[in-house]
């Protein structure tokens, strides 16, 4: 079967379903793909196909994630859905499946539950910027006031975690009834079935409310340095993969991290032994730098657009600690623990100053399998920004994954 071609001119957005177990995330994912397929926008995916999510590895952690894609009139979407709660936690913290926005699924029959709260908190901490809410299982509610009550509760919860609770669009419906309508008539068009229309209304809200993200190429230039060598008569070359932005010969860049920030000019760019005028996000490239000695550069520094990123040593982070079965520690650890923090291309030693539970109370120790907020101090300053991912390692093996939620100094 030929792969379906998507329109490359439409803007692309990464999205995901989040929410409490059994509130209908996977059923909704199936309903969205099926409803849009009936409009000729993508391939319908069954619940079982999505639920049997393949395992993948991100930063040494195994995560089960299902990826589906579909399009609306306006945009092309890559959509991620996870079978288990632990998979969501791992996914959001490692950034394995980056989300530009989320659909929060809440069962109208049950209202917000513990994982609803936890996913909203996580979305805030890891920098999922926007979400739209789908109140599912509307058919199980006889009283319109009850639906309104659930909506108010969810809006309050969103506001509590600093999302604009009063502005976020809410759509109610039944993913299951929409799927049933579509399975008996796969060619249903807009306006022909109440439940299918509600799924399409949800996607209209996603189209309207979740902004198209800035493309990596349009962001300010950053490249983590992987290696450095000197070429006799030409100077020093730093190699790595451009994380974002673009760079041209003649532009000024800054070397940031581990030592004092230093400004230098790009005198040449090379890729696969060929010289280039410009390098872009995603390129593996060698950058020739003016007036810099090989000894000035170390793996773990970054080259960046001047003023766009600064070195820091202390930050707050949201961390998932691996279980023994995942190859993590067998025993708990306490504050004062000094592992290595693997950031971009290098390990930096740091100490964990404090642990904080979701309710803001201090935690004494952390067990394998926990998710916790921790304050970290590094022994060397490195280029850090909010939303940056890192791994925690001990003796070369990964024991945790984290994301920077706030820079302290």
UniProtKB/Swiss-Prot annotation:
Residues 19-26 are annotated as: G1. It comes from Cyanophora paradoxa. It is an enzyme of class 3 (hydrolase). It catalyses: GTP + H2O = GDP + phosphate + H(+). It comes from the Eukaryota. Keywords: Cyanelle, Elongation factor, GTP-binding, Hydrolase, Magnesium, Metal-binding, Nucleotide-binding, Plastid, Protein biosynthesis. Residues 136-139 are annotated as: G4. It holds the Pfam family GTP_EFTU_D2. Its main location: plastid. GTP hydrolase that promotes the GTP-dependent binding of aminoacyl-tRNA to the A-site of ribosomes during protein biosynthesis. This is Elongation factor Tu, cyanelle. GTP binds at residues 19-26, 81-85, 136-139. Belongs to the TRAFAC class translation factor GTPase superfamily. Classic translation factor GTPase family. EF-Tu/EF-1A subfamily. Residues 81-84 are annotated as: G3. It is found in: Plastid, Cyanelle. Gene3D superfamilies: P-loop containing nucleotide triphosphate hydrolases, Translation factors. GO terms for molecular function: GTP binding; GTPase activity; translation elongation factor activity. The keyword Nucleus does not apply. Residues 60-64 are annotated as: G2. Residues 174-176 are annotated as: G5. The keyword GTP-binding applies.
